[in-house]
UniProtKB/Swiss-Prot annotation:
Chain's role: Cotranslationally removes the N-terminal methionine from nascent proteins. The N-terminal methionine is often cleaved when the second residue in the primary sequence is small and uncharged (Met-Ala-, Cys, Gly, Pro, Ser, Thr, or Val).
Gene: metap1
Known EC number: 3.4.11.18
Keyword set includes Zinc-finger: yes
Binding positions (a protein): 203, 301
Residues binding Zn(2+) 2: 22, 25, 48, 52
Catalytic activity: Release of N-terminal amino acids, preferentially methionine, from peptides and arylamides
Protein name per Swiss-Prot or TrEMBL: Methionine aminopeptidase 1
Gene Ontology CC: cytosolic ribosome
Compartments where located: Cytoplasm
Length: 385
């Protein structure tokens, strides 16, 4: 599950912090559109104004109804919301699933707002914890279990299966391993895993929409056991996908693995974004800026912050005992994102597809250990094997 990056200027090549928002976009209900200065805003105007035209055109198009699928009446949860792509939520959601009391729970599990007080206590710090031998063994165990749970989800992915059904299987797989599904009630996230289909970048909420032939879907798993979190995700093909989807998914996985190859003591965390963006751009794709990799151990999200785009300002140098995730989100079109009114589902602003892969890594004395590595198929992800 990705960490949220602070907003950066949307002007191509500018990575300054952005606090100014386009007033026309606000009026039209277009999310995002942040710039660092009037100069950058004016310099981007020629391309940026096309967003305004698209939003106006969408409002005058005759309405079609995406809310009926195979005789199943779906409730539109946000009437009037302008979707960027073809995907629609399929509501109502099922209630939040219970977790047996005998399973150890993270501090946010029963908080009314899902707030992690242990994370809040360290918010803003850039100090990166060096894990003890005991901590490292705990991380190895929980990451192995997280990998097993993702394997259960992988067997579920096929046309006609709903992401809600995948979530149910994930929930049961966590419970059977005496694990708490870390996303559940994390800042009130309502499900046990994230399922992100097509134009969804990350944090998609599982619902009753059946997967369709040609979809791509990312399943993001985090589990909590004995005080530690283990986090990973993969993007899967649903049935037969087009060549564009294959190129996107393959490139995204290559971005992750090329970054992992550079992980070793002495490397600056900011360097990973340079590696990822170089490979993505060489293949005609863009890199999401709003969501990042993160430190993980007894806390779900903590230092370091690990942006995936070039010329970022991430703080920190890798040392043995650091544990963190790399989880690049790569897009067919532009990197700009919006969020559905559910407050979680991040989607591409242009409605084009996005893919993601994630591993949890331990920095060793000479390189790194992939804690969430797949034990079968020589470690290859499911889309290859």
């Amino acid at each position: 599950m990705a960490a949220v990056e602070s907003r950066v200027c949307e002007t191509e090549g500018c990575s300054s912090e952005a606090k100014l928002q386009c007033p026309t976009c606000i009026k039209l209900g277009i999310q995002g559109s942040y710039f660092c200065s009037q100069e950058c805003f004016k310099g981007s105007w020629a391309s940026h104004k096309l967003l305004h035209k698209k939003a106006k055109d969408d409002k005058i198009k005759p309405e079609t109804s995406p809310w009926t699928m195979d005789g199943d009446i779906n409730t539109d949860p946000w009437p009037g919301y302008r979707y960027t792509g073809k995907l629609r939520p399929h509501y109502p959601l099922t209630p939040m699933r219970p977790v047996p009391s005998y399973i150890q729970r993270p501090d946010y599990a029963d908080h009314p707002l899902g707030m992690s007080e242990s994370e809040q206590a360290l918010k803003g710090t850039s100090q990166i914890k060096i894990l003890s031998t005991e901590d490292i063994e705990g991380m190895r165990v929980v990451c192995r279990l997280a990998r097993e749970v993702l394997g259960v989800a992988a067997m579920m992915v096929k046309s006609g299966i709903t992401t809600e059904e995948i979530d149910h299987a994930v929930h049961l797989a966590c419970i059977s391993r005496n694990c708490y599904p870390s996303p559940l009630n994390y800042y009130n996230f309502p499900k046990s895993c994230c399922t992100s289909v097509n134009e969804v970048i990350c944090h998609g909420i599982p619902d009753r929409r059946p997967l369709q032939d040609g979809d791509i879907v990312n399943v993001d798993i985090t589990v909590y056991r004995d005080g530690y979190h283990g986090d990973l995700n993969e993007t899967f093909y649903v049935g037969d996908v087009d060549e564009g989807a294959k190129r996107l998914v393959e490139t995204t996985y290559e971005c992750l693995m090329q970054a992992i190859d550079e992980v070793k003591p002495g490397v600056r965390y900011r360097e990973l974004g340079n590696i990822i963006q170089k490979h993505a751009q060489a293949n005609g794709f863009s890199v999401v800026r709003s969501y990042c990799g993160h430190g993980i151990h007894k806390l779900f999200h903590t230092a370091p912050n690990v942006p995936h785009y070039a010329k970022n300002k991430a703080v920190g140098v890798m040392k043995p005992g650091h544990v963190f995730t790399i989880e690049p989100m790569i897009c067919e079109g532009g990197w700009q994102d919006e969020t559905w009114p559910d407050g979680w589902t991040a989607i591409t602003r242009d409605g084009k597809r996005s893919a993601q892969f994630e591993h949890t890594l331990l920095v060793t004395e000479t390189g790194c250990e992939i804690l969430t590595r797949r034990l079968e198929e020589n470690g290859r992800p499911h889309f290859i094997s």
